C-alpha cells in the first residue's frame, strides 16, 4: 500500500484497513497524499488526487494530467480520470471519494452523469477547504455531492429516467467495413487495434450527440490500451476518447512517457456531427510525434 496502484482490489483494501484499525471508507483519505505523486502536471505543478470506493468494494485512483504545448481543455481532471478508471474496470457505481482539493465546477458537472450522483459522498482532505455551513457531514466527515452542486443540470433534464448512464452497460451496435478505412495497408497489429477501438466505441457514452467513438493505443512493447468518448449533459466537461485511452496508459503503462506510444486507432461515425479526428490527431502528434494514427469509420448495424 506504500505505492498504491490505480485499482486496489476489495480484499487488499479490507486488509489494509484492518491493519490500520479503520474502515475501508476511513482508509480513503490516507491514500490521497501518496496518490498525488502520480499526477502529471508540467504546466500547473498542482497535483490533484482522488481516491474512490466503488460498489464492488474496490478502490480506484484518479489524478490530473496536463499536456504542454496544447490548449488547456485537453487536460484530464482528477475526477475525470477516476470516472474513466471506473468505466475501464467495469465498476457500476461510485459510493465515496476523497480528494485533495475541492472539485472544480467542471468535475462537479461531469460527475452528474453517474446515477444518483447527489448521493455520492465526498471528503476534501485539504484543511483549507471548508464545507458549506449548511451541509451536514457524516460521522466520517463525508458530505453529499449534492451539497456541492445543489441546483444541478444533468441527464435527468435531457434523458428518460431509464436511460443507461455513464457507469452502466452500453452497446452502440457499431460495425466497421474494411472499405471505410482511410488508411493504406492493414497489418495484423493494426487489425487488432481496429477491433479494440471498435469495442471501445461500442461502450462509448454519447446520449446527447449520438456520436460514439473509441480509441486504442499501442506502446513500443506491444501493449494495447483503450478508451471511449463520454459525454456530459453540459457538453464541455465531456471526456474525449484519446484522453480516456491515455488514462489507461497512465494507469497501466508503467509510468512511461507518451513517446512510447507508437500507434493509435480512432473509430467514429463518418457522418458524426461531433467528430474526434482532428482534435485526436492534434493531441497525439503533440505528445508522441512518431505515433502512427489511423481512423476507421463505423456504422450502426
Swiss-Prot record:
Cofactor: how bound: Binds 1 zinc ion per subunit.
Domain of life of the organism encoding this protein: Eukaryota
GO CC terms in record: cytosol; mitochondrion
Catalytic activity: cytidine + H2O + H(+) = uridine + NH4(+); 2'-deoxycytidine + H2O + H(+) = 2'-deoxyuridine + NH4(+)
Keyword Ribonucleoprotein: no
Protein name per Swiss-Prot or TrEMBL: Cytidine deaminase 1
GO-annotated biological processes: cytidine catabolic process; cytidine deamination
Activity regulation as described: Inhibited by uridine, CMP and dCMP.
Cofactor: Zn(2+)
Gene3D superfamilies named in the record: Cytidine Deaminase, domain 2
Annotated catalytic residues: 79 (proton donor)
Binding site for Zn(2+): 77, 104, 107
This protein's UniProt keywords: Hydrolase, Metal-binding, Zinc
pH dependency: Optimum pH is 7.5-8.0.
UniProt keyword Iron, yes or no: no
Species this chain originates from: Arabidopsis thaliana
InterPro entries: APOBEC/CMP_deaminase_Zn-bd, CMP_dCMP_dom, Cyd/dCyd_deaminase_Zn-bd, Cyt/Deoxycyt_deaminase, Cyt_deam_dimer, Cytidine_deaminase-like
Annotated positions binding substrate: 64-66
Tissue: Expressed in roots, rosette leaves, stems and flowers.
Family according to the record: Belongs to the cytidine and deoxycytidylate deaminase family.
Name of the gene this protein is made from: CDA1
The protein's role, per its UniProt record: This enzyme scavenges exogenous and endogenous cytidine and 2'-deoxycytidine for UMP synthesis. Functions as a conventional cytidine deaminase. Has no affinity for RNA and is not involved in RNA-editing by C-to-U deamination.
CMP/dCMP-type deaminase domain location: 23-156, 188-301
GO terms, molecular function: cytidine deaminase activity; protein homodimerization activity; zinc ion binding
Amino acid at each position: 500500500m506504500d505505492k498504491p496502484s490505480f485499482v486496489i482490489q476489495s480484499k487488499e483494501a479490507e486488509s489494509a484497513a484492518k491493519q490500520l484499525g479503520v474502515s475501508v471508507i476511513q482508509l480513503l483519505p490516507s491514500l490521497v497524499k501518496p496518490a498525488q505523486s502520480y499526477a502529471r502536471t508540467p504546466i500547473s505543478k498542482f497535483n490533484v488526487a482522488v481516491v474512490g470506493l466503488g460498489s464492488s468494494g474496490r478502490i480506484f485512483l484518479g489524478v490530473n494530467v496536463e499536456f504542454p504545448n496544447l490548449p488547456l481543455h485537453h487536460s484530464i481532471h482528477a475526477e475525470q480520470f477516476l470516472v474513466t478508471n471506473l468505466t475501464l474496470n467495469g465498476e457500476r457505481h461510485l459510493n465515496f471519494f476523497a480528494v485533495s482539493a475541492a472539485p472544480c465546477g467542471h468535475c462537479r458537472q461531469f460527475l452528474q452523469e453517474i446515477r444518483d450522483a447527489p448521493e455520492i459522498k465526498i471528503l476534501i482532505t485539504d484543511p483549507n477547504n471548508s464545507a458549506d455551513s449548511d451541509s451536514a457531514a457524516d460521522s466520517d466527515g463525508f458530505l453529499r455531492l449534492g451539497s456541492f452542486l445543489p441546483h444541478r443540470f444533468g441527464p435527468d433534464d435531457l434523458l428518460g429516467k431509464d436511460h443507461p448512464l455513464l457507469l452502466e452497460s452500453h452497446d452502440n451496435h457499431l460495425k466497421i467495413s474494411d472499405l471505410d478505412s482511410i488508411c493504406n495497408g492493414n497489418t495484423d497489429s493494426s487489425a487488432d487495434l481496429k477491433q479494440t477501438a471498435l469495442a471501445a466505441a461500442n461502450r462509448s457514452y454519447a446520449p446527447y450527440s449520438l456520436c460514439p467513438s473509441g480509441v486504442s493505443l499501442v506502446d513500443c512493447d506491444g501493449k494495447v490500451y483503450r478508451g471511449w468518448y463520454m459525454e456530459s449533459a453540459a457538453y464541455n466537461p465531456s471526456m474525449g476518447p484519446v484522453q480516456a485511452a491515455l488514462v489507461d496508459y497512465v494507469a497501466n503503462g508503467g509510468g512511461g512517457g507518451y513517446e512510447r506510444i507508437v500507434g493509435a486507432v480512432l473509430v467514429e461515425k463518418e457522418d458524426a456531427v461531433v467528430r474526434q479526428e482532428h482534435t485526436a490527431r492534434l493531441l497525439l502528434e503533440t505528445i508522441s510525434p512518431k505515433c502512427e494514427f489511423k481512423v476507421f469509420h463505423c456504422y450502426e448495424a
